[in-house]
């Protein structure tokens, strides 16, 4: 199951989510930094090579909605400097501070006054673009990008499991949680398939996957980092939803006879386009 089977139920998603309350809790930001999947080297290489088609000298990248810097640090080997920007102070506090060409700032994707116009080779957003004011973010990207600069939006689908019994339960779990997703996540559930970047010649890459074997506890740790779990717990404080998920996963694994862990796969998508040359 990718996110696709849930897309028809997007109308169940919430219209009453206070985005300002998201990722302000240090425990959740630490869980995000520790338990979210790390992007593969193939993703960073794919985007960097696309950038070099029009700007071979990769001087500056900006990673907006960077969270604790999981994608920012992946681009560091390709660019002379990269700046990670996130609106959450706790996410930025969890970013690494020992990479010489990485800088992290608290800020909004649509307001980057500390970046000079026409100086950026790559403006990117990983697993966060759906949270942003899109038209304003595109306008700010256009301001800071060099002619020929690249805009890249990427992310991953909901995880799938290789054990049928586990996969069946995961679908039930996501259906239970979908009312706790904000409406701005609708396109993310559809892998941004209808998203149009502001430049001509947009390309899409759906060929990269990320797989990792997880125990039940490791999967629970991943779920702890997600917003729907936080929202569900806030509205249903009497329930132990993570404990329930753990019990159901353990039972599914026991029923399958497949051992104590399972293979989890995230399908990655990338959208890229070049700003036209002058």
PLM-predicted stretches and their roles:
Residues 113-122:
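A short acidic, Gly/Pro-enriched loop at the edge of an enzyme's catalytic core
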Residues 58-60, 118:
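Nucleotide donor/acceptor-binding cores
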Residues 132-140:
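A short, conserved alpha-helix within the catalytic core of class I
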Residues 2-56:
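Conserved class I S-adenosyl-L-methionine
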Residues 142, 146-214:
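Conserved catalytic/acceptor-binding region of the Class I
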Residues 125-126, 134:
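A short beta-strand submotif of the Rossmann-like class I SAM-dependent methyltransferase core
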Residues 60-62, 67-112:
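Class I SAM-dependent methyltransferase SAM/SAH-binding core
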Residues 191-278:
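Conserved Class I S-adenosyl-L-methionine
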């Amino acid at each position: 199951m990718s996110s696709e089977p849930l897309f028809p139920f997007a109308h169940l998603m919430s219209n009453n989510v206070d985005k300002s309350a998201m990722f302000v809790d240090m425990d959740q930001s630490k869980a995000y930094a520790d338990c979210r999947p790390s992007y593969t080297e193939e993703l960073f290489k794919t985007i960097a090579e696309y950038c070099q088609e029009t700007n071979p000298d990769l001087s500056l990248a900006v990673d907006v909605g960077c969270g604790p810097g999981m994608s920012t640090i992946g681009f560091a080997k390709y660019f002379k400097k990269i700046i990670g920007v996130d609106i959450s102070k706790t996410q930025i506090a969890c970013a690494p501070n020992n990479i010489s060409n990485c800088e992290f700032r608290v800020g909004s994707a649509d307001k980057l006054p500390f970046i000079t116009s026409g100086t950026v080779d790559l403006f990117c957003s990983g697993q966060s673009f759906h949270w942003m004011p899109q038209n304003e973010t595109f306008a700010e990207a256009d301001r800071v990008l060099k002619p020929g600069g690249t805009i890249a939006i990427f992310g991953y689908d909901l995880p799938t499991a290789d054990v049928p019994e586990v996969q069946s339960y995961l679908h039930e779990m996501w259906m239970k949680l979908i009312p706790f997703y904000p409406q701005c996540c609708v396109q993310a559930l559809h892998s941004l398939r209808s998203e149009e970047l502001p430049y001509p010649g947009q390309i899409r890459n759906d060929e990269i996957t990320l797989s990792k074997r997880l125990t039940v506890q490791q999967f629970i740790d991943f779920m702890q980092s997600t917003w729907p779990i936080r929202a569900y717990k806030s509205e249903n404080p009497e329930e132990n939803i993570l404990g329930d998920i753990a019990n159901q996963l353990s039972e599914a694994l026991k029923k399958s006879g497949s051992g104590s862990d399972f293979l989890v796969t995230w399908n990655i998508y990338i959208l890229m386009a070049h700003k036209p040359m002058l």
